[in-house]
Amino acid sequence: MAVAPPLPPAPARLLRRWQGSSPWLSSSFGRTRYFSRPAFAAGGRQDYSPSSGMGVSKTGAFRLGLHGNLNVQSSVQEWVDETKRLFFLRTTNNVRNNITNGTTPLRVGNLRHDPSEDIRSSNYPSLYNQRERGPSNSIVNRHVDTDLAKHRVMYQSAHAVPAPFSVANNDIKPLNLLDGSKEEIPWHDSVTVESSLPKVSKSETTLVVDKAIPNKKEHKRITRKVTLNIPDKASLSTESKNARKLLATIYDKVLVVDNVESARSVVKLLTTKYKGFIHACDTEVANIDVKEETPVGHGEVICFSIYSGNSDGEADFGNGKTCIWVDVLDGGRDVLMEFAPFFEDPSIKKVWHNYSFDSHVIENCGIKVAGFHADTMHLARLWDSSRRADGGYSLEGLTNDHRIMNAVLKDIHKTGKVSMKTIFGRKNVRKNGSEGKTISIEPVKKLQREDRELWICYSSLDSMSTLKLYESLKNKLEAKEWIFDGCPRGTMYDFYEEYWRPFGALLVKMETEGMFVDRAYLSEIEKTAVVERKLAADKFRKWASKHCPDAKYMNVNSDNQIRQLFFGGIKNRNKPGETWPQSKAFKVPNDESIATEGKKIPKSRTIKLFTIVEDLKLFTTEGKKTTKTGWLKVRGDVLWSLAGKIPTDHIYKIDDDGQEFDEDGSSVELPEQDIEDTSPYGTAYEAFGGGKKGREACHAIAALCEVFSIDKLISGFIVPLQGDHISCKEGRIHCSLNINTETGRLSARTPSLQNQPALEKDRYKIRQAFVAAPGNTLIVADYGQLELRILAHLTNCKSMLEAFKAGGDFHSRTAMNMYQHVRDAVEEKKVLLEWHPQPGQDKPPVPLLKDAFGAERRKAKMLNFSIAYGKTAVGLSQDWNVEVREARDTLKLWHRDRKEISAWQKKQKALAFEKCEVYTLLGRSRQFPNMTHAGPGQKSHVERAAINAPVQGSAADVAMCAMLEIERNARLKELGWRLLLQVHDEVILEGPTESAEEAKAIVVECMSKPFYGTNILKVDLAVDAKYAKSWYAAK
């Protein structure tokens, strides 16, 4: 039995749509269908047929048959789409390409361009369900597992073609399959004719040719392996079909602009007749990863839409066209530039959903966007700052939420935004033909070119939905009272116009400015970080291998392997009956190239790790975080609790034998101490027996913690800051600044500059990489204890107001008021609250309070900040590692002289439960869910948030007002200074070096009096400012 090699790859499909209308095309497709058959490709090879199975008659004519149960809709477009999909079922076509009727080459017909001919003539393919064929015909049958799916495709003959290619090779020769030949191909159940097949995947199947032998009553069966092309895209879901049908209803409302002449006509209307309207704008952009890349300098606008309206209704651009859709793909740059007068006119009011993104991508094309009127994302956050469900703040989520849209005008289109995933997404198909879970979407350029009408509707709906959303949110905010620091001030839409509208424009301006980054410096500290990480990892492995030999080869980034070393035998929190094993085997990379003699070196090897701690009771897991699967998390606090508070420099000074390195790298034996101070060490000290072994364990585990810390700095800051995806050609990074926190604080992403490591943890001085351009300087200005000052103002706390008025070390004063023995020491002048050295003085005459009573001051400091965050005695006990009773007693000491704060906290909790919202200084609100049926955990969370939100939110209000004050300052503009970044309570500006001193004084003045040149708070706003070439030096 001969087995032929796989079939050659099939040529790309071609499809020619029928132009014009024909009576016979409008008839029902229940019995007969018609389609155009493209001409053959050059070189004599015939093109693919829209077939799922073939039959060849004695006359050489093909006929297409459909399964009796196939759902056939009487729609031309439906049939055309189905025909397209059938083109991709290529296996049977490969068979058909190689079938001849006896020794006669295959004949295939082309559809004539004259549809007036009788449809029964041989020039038109007919489509019908072939149940049976005579024995004289050569049939191609496709099996669906055991059932024969009678999907047959046959064509009428019109023009002869060259002999087809052989199955075995590309030679032009007939296969000479005679009458009665039969070919069978197994097929998968889930692969339907209706599948959409823009791509195909391959799987191997068996082709069986049952060949009749002339003049004999026997057949010769030939079996060969062939490649079966299986679709990798499933059919549209019912949801997608319904959404498409609804979406198509807006097409008649859209005016398509795709040339310069029509663009000029539209722009003339926009800038004259409809200039006073509100214009909602939206862009569609290709060549950008919105999750990773900044839109500044990235992305390509392929189309945009504009939808205009006012209180009287929609703009009309002729023939009922109310929305403009502009095609700028494939050479449409000139069309886009015609809209520059519209976009750049500051008097034309424009509304956006995510103004930042759209404005940047338009400005990439050389158009400076002006006339910002509203960002519906900001309006939605002002209305409800705590949306987490129902799509959050996406355009789809907002416009399909009746609670948001119930204030919209009735005459505006009612269709809410529909996601691209719903309209264009299709599930992939697995290799076995079954439907997968992953949904993929074609590139937007392809969608715009090939699904043009649907794409026009989809992208136009964005601007239509944006205007509708703006109208509804504006109505809602106008109905909500604005309370400014306890006094009525107007409506919340008035607040938006006065503060958040200019603030939104300022944030976009700051994003455009960006900040210069020294990549050469980042590259150098990356090398240092990699070396130090290796040293720390090797230190830990060396120590661990003393207790477990295979730990020498372990992956220090594997939580499971670390858990195995320290926590074998712990119980699963989700499944109490399940425990982590005492020993376990792991696969690790074979970096040492270990191999069995005579065999190849494997890429991986197996190691065995076992638990190295005997007394697990010393490792308390109570109150520790667990993974989703119920196992103890082994990062962060858990490992540091084992190591203790060991300075990081000790990790590189103490080796595994308890020795300290000299300057030259040699080591000397540490002297034994009569009384060892064990306070810096964690629970691992006792667990490993104390003394030398205990110290070794703590230092080794601290080294492991350093591995994680260094990894975080490398992956989170050092490497990303060097990427092109967040920077432009000038070397400046452009992060995205967003008002998207529940309290109103800014967040920054791509990159997340808000999460820069604290100075004491910034071991590689990452801020040193943020520098001013040549000839410029950075000013870094920071509020001092802003949230505590806000708390003092909101609560009118006499003790705190007096402490801030007196000045000095606030936390030392708090400790003095909390602890009588500290107060006695201050009054007896044994310690000083603070000390300001005079010329010639090197040290204070007596110790400072922060040095003599460090523990008390640390507790006071933590309490000062914890109270503002609503932390309870339970939380404090965990922070201090003490009993809850002790933490509660300390908390009472703090509240003893601050009764106003206790009363204010009760009031905030009551507001959260009664009105389901609390308010900031400027009157913004944070909403909470109804607590009537909430559990204890949820109630506790809301109580803490009710205390924290007004404080943090008011601090955000102050920072915003300060930035607006700086932006409005004419002198700073004249000197050439501009805002670059805001990180929490800190702002950064850049400008000419020669005017740095004057500019710094102006910035301090603006920040200390941020409310139009005044300070409405009961306490002064302390501002510390410096200028230098880098962010680090100016801190």
UniProtKB/Swiss-Prot annotation:
GO BP field: DNA-templated DNA replication; double-strand break repair
A single Gene Ontology CC term: mitochondrion
Location(s), subcellular: Mitochondrion
Catalytic activity: DNA(n) + a 2'-deoxyribonucleoside 5'-triphosphate = DNA(n+1) + diphosphate
Regulation: Not inhibited by aphidicolin.
Enzyme class of the recorded protein, top EC level: transferase
UniProt cross-references to SUPFAM superfamilies, sorted A to Z: DNA/RNA polymerases, Ribonuclease H-like
Presequence boundaries: 1-42
EC id: 2.7.7.7
Region (Polymerase): 699-1032
Gene Ontology MF term list: 3'-5' exonuclease activity; DNA binding; DNA-directed DNA polymerase activity
Predominant cellular place of this UniProt entry's protein: mitochondrion
Domain of life: Eukaryota
InterPro entries cross-referenced by the UniProt entry: 3'-5'_exonuclease_dom, DNA-dir_DNA_pol_A_palm_dom, DNA/RNA_pol_sf, DNA_polymerase_A, RNaseH-like_sf, RNaseH_sf
Span list, region Disordered: 100-124
Boundaries of every 3'-5' exonuclease domain copy: 317-478
Signal peptide location: none
UniProt keyword terms in alphabetical order: DNA damage, DNA repair, DNA replication, DNA-binding, DNA-directed DNA polymerase, Exonuclease, Hydrolase, Mitochondrion, Nuclease, Nucleotidyltransferase, Transferase, Transit peptide
A Pfam family of this chain: DNA_pol_A_exo1
Function: In addition to polymerase activity, this DNA polymerase exhibits 5'-3' exonuclease activity. May be required for DNA replication and accumulation in mitochondria.
PANTHER family, per database record: DNA POLYMERASE I (PTHR10133), DNA POLYMERASE NU (PTHR10133:SF27)
UniProt family annotation: Belongs to the DNA polymerase type-A family.
This protein's name: DNA polymerase I B, mitochondrial
Lineage, highest ranks first: Eukaryota, Viridiplantae, Streptophyta, Embryophyta, Tracheophyta
